[in-house]
Amino acid sequence: NGFNNHRAIQSLMVITGRFDRPGTALPDYETYCHSNGGFASLEEEFVDQVRPKTDKKGVGRERFPLWADMVDEAQGMDLANQILSGKPYPLKAGVLLGVNTRMYPDTRRFVRALDQLDFILADDIFWTEACRHADLVLPASTSFERSEVKCYAGKFINYTKPVIPPVHDNRDDARIICELASALDLDDPLLRSGYDKCLQYIMSPGGIQDWDAFRAHDGPIPVPNARPYVPGTYLKEGPRTPTGKLELYSEAVAKYRDRGLDPLPVYADSDDRADPEEYPFVFCTGARLSNAVHTRVHKCSWPRALRQDASVD
């Protein structure tokens, strides 16, 4: 219902004309890592140029086809099923970068699935359950020990700086991936060249002339080629929908009506057939805590103060 609630709100904006006009909801475009920097990067090209040419579908595509149509990612919620069943094809190894086993449904079953893999490489900043089930564990850098490129909606870009030197022999995820690509001699020269060169390529449409000066600069800088969005552009170019219109009845969802999905954003009652008078409470295992991110920061004093007592949600 969260998905349909979002769709309903968007539909009301369309019906009342409060979309893609000055002072209304405006479409959002992604520059890098789901952030809008006001310019089109080469992030998709960076991936597509070396995308494996295979007929193997991503994990979860058959079970979650709408997700697969909308998001260029596998669906991890189906990972354990594929490992255990070997269908539609077997999985033999896993690279677990900061994987939190508690995020997955039926955690014990997920861990059992991991144990069936022939090899697991894991990295993390803590000795987690995933690390305990790995064959090789690499220490990862915290955000305090590494740099990264970030872009912002204000048309700025920033090359962050580490605030402390690396503690012991840890490395950040991107460096681990790039160095593994070199060690395995993958056919991807750009990836083998390292994180900095990759980001220089991805962000090149932004028009930054002196990348070294940008990397050395303390704080964000304006992106030369970034431009503010002009209201009305999206509607003028035509919505990227099957009908080319703003759809209240989603044709993309309609393809999967046999999966129980409704093209209209309607409320779906619980599948539980219990009598609400006799059983007035609903047990929810997916509730979000405002003071934590999954299993993170539970032991930090200031967010813990927002929720001092343990409870059952």
Report each predicted region and the residues it spans.
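Non-catalytic, well-ordered alpha-helical segments in soluble enzyme domains
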Residues: 174-190
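A generic secondary-structure signal for well-formed alpha-helical elements
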Residues: 16-23, 134, 141, 184-188
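A structural signal for short, well-ordered beta-strand segments and their strand-loop junctions
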Residues: 22-28, 122, 139, 192
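A glycine-rich phosphate-binding loop feature that marks nucleotide/adenosyl-phosphate handling sites
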Residues: 25-36, 193-207
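Non-catalytic, well-ordered alpha-helical scaffold segments
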Residues: 6, 10, 174-178, 281
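Acidic catalytic cores of enzymes that act on phosphate-bearing nucleotides/polynucleotides
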Residues: 1-85
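Generic alpha-helical structural context detector
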Residues: 10-14, 139, 178, 182
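A cross-kingdom feature strongest in bacterial/archaeal respiratory oxidoreductases
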Residues: 57-169, 201-313
